[in-house]
Amino acid sequence: MELKLATAEKQVLDELVKLLQSRDLRGENGNWKEFLHVYDKNADSPSDPSRRSHEDLVQFLTTFKKKEDLQLLKCHANHLLIENLKQESQDEDTPEQMLVRLTVEHPSYSLDYSFKPYSEDWFVSDVGMKMKKVMESTNMVAVDCEMVLCEDGTEGLVRVGVVDRDLKVILDEFVKPNKPVVDYRTDITGITAEDIENASLSVVDIQETLQPFLSTGTILVGHSLNRDLEVLKIDHPKVIDTALVFKYPNTRKLRRPSLNNLCKSILGYEVRKTGVPHDCVHDASAAMKLALAVVEKRVDTTIKPSKEMLEVEKAKLFLHKIPNNVPSEELEQVLSGKFTLDVKQAKTQGRYYCAFALFHSSEDADQAFEHIDGIEMTDSLGLPQKVVIIKLSSGSRASIYVRKMVQDE
């Protein structure tokens, strides 16, 4: 870590020492004042970190050896990197940096990317401690993951795809979950128990493969990328999230266009047909193509939904606040009629997940909503929704919310 600290900006080192001071954390030579007492015998020397030399600060910081302390320092340096980016003028932004800026300035960014990566199995990028040249790198790789539901209600990584700027596949591997799996979500992921039976790679192996890219300041690209980073257990500040970059006009900022709708609007094709399982390499490539459409072709990040897209939205119902212990197969009982379920992995390893019910037409979706035996209400944005109680095959009960995607006319 000393070599990496030696390349850090003086201002970053000042803030890191102040952080350690505020938490009264101790390295091998004690806290900051105790360190100075040993390191510098001159009683008149200043203790304010901003008045100490670059070398003094590095000497103190290198006395911290515990992994959790190092994780804390790197996280704080990365946070400073993002805050500095927000304060800097946009005039000199490269197109890639502009997309990073659009991501980190989105109202949902701070919540979606507020990881707590202090456990042993997390990898925290050290790019915030690098020289400005490295931090300004415009190299990009796109990432997408497939996840399953584990016995303890968390998400388990089972496949990861990574492509570079030229859409060359860097990584396409199955990963062995380290917990028992209760739902492979095969209809969504296309993955079965047999697919990962012989998988030998772990999350740590994937982290080690990506580490050279992260340490050189490469930008990670993805759609709802926070979900992928959460399951990869990677904290990296330089991200382009196409779910946050692109937006619909005259709609609430928190409404995010789907990857499929973005591809239809900007690239002119669907990333997948309805009912076809996900493919992480295809999804990673789609996210990279969307980023490149802005970088190379200056495509507008505000997209206008077509009549076809609006009709597609009307033909959906949104099932949300689904407890993680409810298998996706049990959701079939909630709605009547013919539909396909598109299950979405949880944004974080929390208590709930969500799904879309895709109907043949808006009329079918409206009829299914009317037939739901539940309490009707509206959400905070005035969209009609119902809360329904279902009985699971296990004998227990669960409450689920079902919401329309568009206001009633």
UniProtKB/Swiss-Prot annotation:
GO cellular component: nucleus
Gene knockout outcome: No visible phenotype; due to the redundancy with other SDN ribonucleases. Simultaneous knockdown of SDN1, SDN2 and SDN3 results in elevated miRNA levels and pleiotropic developmental defects.
GO molecular function: 3'-5' exonuclease activity; 3'-5'-exoribonuclease activity involved in mature miRNA 3'-end processing; 3'-5'-RNA exonuclease activity; miRNA binding
Subcellular location: Nucleus
UniProt keyword list: Exonuclease, Hydrolase, Nuclease, Nucleus
Enzyme class: hydrolase
InterPro entries: Exonuclease_RNaseT/DNA_pol3, Nucleotide-bd_a/b_plait_sf, RBD_domain_sf, REX1-like_exo, REXO1/3/4-like, RNaseH-like_sf, RNaseH_sf
UniProt xrefs under Gene3D superfamilies: 3.30.70.330, Ribonuclease H-like superfamily/Ribonuclease H
The EC number(s) this enzyme carries: 3.1.-.-
Domain Exonuclease: 140-291
Signal peptide: none
Key word Nuclease present: yes
The keyword Secreted is assigned to this record: no
Alphabetized CDD domains for the sequence: REX1_like, RRM_SF
Main location: nucleus
Biological processes per GO annotation: miRNA catabolic process
Similarity remark: Belongs to the REXO1/REXO3 family.
The protein's role, per its UniProt record: 3'-5' exonuclease degrading single-stranded small RNAs.
Note: Presence of 2'-O-methyl or 3'poly-U in the small RNA deters the activity of SDN1.
Family annotation (PANTHER family): RNA EXONUCLEASE REXO1 / RECO3 FAMILY MEMBER-RELATED, SMALL RNA DEGRADING NUCLEASE 1-RELATED
Protein name: Small RNA degrading nuclease 1
Gene name per UniProt: SDN1
